């Protein structure tokens, strides 16, 4: 069984077996008896790597043995291995030729946080969002069948990701087409079953064996001529399996369910995977693992160790504390509790983001009004719509990148019916090391085209609080988008008063140049304005746009510059340009925002600089346009 470590090593561990097995070909040359020692070495290597770089932590520790077993038994990359989400894929990356690059993990121009097709042939499908693996692996299995290929397709999905409807849609379709594929449920929360042990492991070996499969198919052919006898045999088998395993649901969906087995028992996993490798039809293996396995603190606190920051050198002097405000998510969490105390109609809804969206306090103070729907964004939005129909005032706390998954529900179920649903959209804009799959780059573009939608962009913590109150009191759907991280430490008012809808605020009066800011780049715009004597406007509202103010600025300035941390195409700046065009106003415009590319992972400051959204970039772009216009 795995060794349990107490500390994260600061020096690279000695790993003689891993040195020979950092590719699947090298791994398969090892004796099976050496694999448990290899697992200990791989676990130490992962601890060291993430300690140096920061990143997702607990999930990878929990799949060390599973990752080794998969690459040992299957002929990757010819056999297609698809990881769901990708939080757990660091061991996979180490074992597939990227060990020497792992210290660049999540850094600019380095290894990505998630599997990427462009990074390695072993990353067969790019991921980041949850619940896509079964659909992708099914598509690969069907393609293999059409190409007369014998390659295997394997999806590894967690118990959390299996709560999403998309996963069950794929499970249902796979049995319809009788796909030859394997789905592995990595149950690291024991939320489906606690029935793991010697008897369950033994049963899994029997049920997955070729002998059992051959006997089962042979009996089916014989007994199918005697319908009564076959029905009795089928029910007897189901009863036997149902007594020992929680696979009834998957069996009813047409899958051959095996498990649960201990995901840290390498011999059992290897034997079971070998048995299942050549079975025909949809196969489902339930593996129970422990998140954070092998690192004692993470086993005790898997949520706290979901991800960690990098270790600082032991002898490094403490850096002076940077003065910054509270996290935007914390401001939202406090507002939610305050408004809930003032309005008993308020309910809070989140798709599995209680900690990330800062809903812990609300969930404890108002448990009857808190709803975590798991990874089910579509359901979350329509649930809110149903509540709003009956007079509740739902607040959906959701990351920008995940709201994309519920766009139809946002339009069809909320907006068309003009329901009072407030969307608190966290992680808007660039999010840093998680890269383009998690960036909130598009919400302004896809929200502002929806009729009746109120769309707001706070420039600081106090503006966020006021906009949340504005959205809560608005008659219709409303959205407030705010970034990851901390604010500029603006004084926060304790009241719950709303803003006047559709009105921006001039923060600095200048001449010739007007900087129209939608969001948190206000501080950078103020710095630039001091250098070029520009007017600075906190636009506040993307929809409805402060059209009167835009016309006034166009009439009194020679260049309008829009600034937003959203895709330029279709964003807030585009709204300004469209409005001026509709009024037949010809005015030089410069739109600064996210370019028409996927901005790769790096530190947030590096990403903003790359996009020209830091103070230096804004100043350079504005001065270049001024020179072109002769200003």
Swiss-Prot record:
The EC number(s) this enzyme carries: 2.2.1.7
Cofactor binding note from Swiss-Prot or TrEMBL: Binds 1 Mg(2+) ion per subunit.
Broad EC category: transferase
Keywords, in A-Z order: Isoprene biosynthesis, Magnesium, Metal-binding, Thiamine biosynthesis, Thiamine pyrophosphate, Transferase
MF (Gene Ontology): 1-deoxy-D-xylulose-5-phosphate synthase activity; magnesium ion binding; thiamine pyrophosphate binding
Residues that, per the record, bind Mg(2+): 159, 188
Entry GO terms, CC: cytosol
Cofactor annotation: Mg(2+); thiamine diphosphate
GO BP, one annotated term: terpenoid biosynthetic process
InterPro entries reported for this sequence: Dxylulose-5-P_synthase, THDP-binding, Transketo_C/PFOR_II, Transketolase-like_Pyr-bd, Transketolase_BS, Transketolase_C
The reaction(s) this protein catalyses: D-glyceraldehyde 3-phosphate + pyruvate + H(+) = 1-deoxy-D-xylulose 5-phosphate + CO2
Assembly and oligomerization: Homodimer.
Protein's job: Catalyzes the acyloin condensation reaction between C atoms 2 and 3 of pyruvate and glyceraldehyde 3-phosphate to yield 1-deoxy-D-xylulose-5-phosphate (DXP).
Family: Belongs to the transketolase family. DXPS subfamily.
Listed name of the protein: 1-deoxy-D-xylulose-5-phosphate synthase
Organism: Pseudomonas putida (strain GB-1)
Gene, per the UniProt record: dxs
